[in-house]
Every structure is written in structure tokens, then in C-alpha cells.
């Protein structure tokens, strides 16, 4: 009797990507666009196949309450797919923009005594806002 590999016992997440999903967070909005091509080359060299994109990008996607910018994200996704990389689009809620904290202070995190934590920390939101 042959023992089946554990990997063979579970269905693939995506049959077009039948490999271990090695990768991590990729935050290109924090770097000049001129570095993105080099990033793709480094991903290729390190067998980095899957990038989580957008975790801290809220302010880059929505620089003002009434303004959205997706051009940079479109460019990054195009570069990733052209370089034969996969991506997971994250919700950009880990770092809310300053305009939101100023316009809606109730979204700021509160400590156990109800004091609001000022803007500038990661994951600075209040779940009950």
C-alpha cells in the first residue's frame, strides 16, 4: 500500500497555481514607482510567487474623502501578473488616513478607560465606531 502525500489529500486553492504559495506583504505604495521593476526581479530570484497588496494603502487609494486613486494599484497588479506573480488584494484598513481621523474622531481607538488614542498608530480604529 502506498501512502498518499498530505499535499495530495487536499484540493488546490487554485489549479492554475499548483505550488506552495510562497510570498508575503508587498507595499509598493511606500516606495518610488521606479523601484517596482527591481522588486519584480527580486521576487523572481527569491521564488516569491504571491504578494499581498494593499494592507496599508488606504491613504494612497483614497487621499481625500471625495477622491480615489487606483492608477498606481493598476500598475502594480499589471507588473505582478506580467512577472508571473499572483496577488491577494487586502482590505486597506490597517492604517486609516489622517483625514478620516480628523473628520470622524469616533473611529479612533479607545483604551480601557475610554480615552481616544491619537492618529498615527497602525490599526488605529475602534471596532465599535
Question: Model segments located where?
Answer:
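The substrate-binding groove and active-site-proximal loops of carbohydrate-active enzymes
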Residues: 21-33, 54-72, 117-129
Amino acid at each position: 500500500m502506498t501512502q498518499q502525500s498530505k499535499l495530495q489529500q487536499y484540493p488546490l486553492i487554485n489549479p492554475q497555481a499548483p505550488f506552495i504559495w510562497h510570498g508575503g506583504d508587498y507595499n509598493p505604495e511606500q516606495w518610488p514607482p521606479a523601484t517596482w521593476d527591481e522588486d519584480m526581479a527580486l521576487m523572481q530570484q527569491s521564488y516569491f510567487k504571491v504578494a499581498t497588496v494593499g494592507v496599508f494603502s488606504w491613504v494612497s487609494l483614497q487621499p481625500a474623502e471625495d477622491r480615489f486613486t487606483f492608477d498606481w494599484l493598476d500598475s502594480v497588479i499589471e507588473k505582478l501578473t506580467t512577472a508571473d506573480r499572483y496577488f491577494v488584494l487586502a482590505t486597506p484598513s490597517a492604517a486609516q488616513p489622517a483625514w478620516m481621523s480628523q473628520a470622524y474622531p469616533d473611529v479612533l481607538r479607545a483604551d480601557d478607560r475610554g480615552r481616544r488614542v491619537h492618529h498615527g498608530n497602525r490599526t488605529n480604529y475602534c471596532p465599535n465606531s
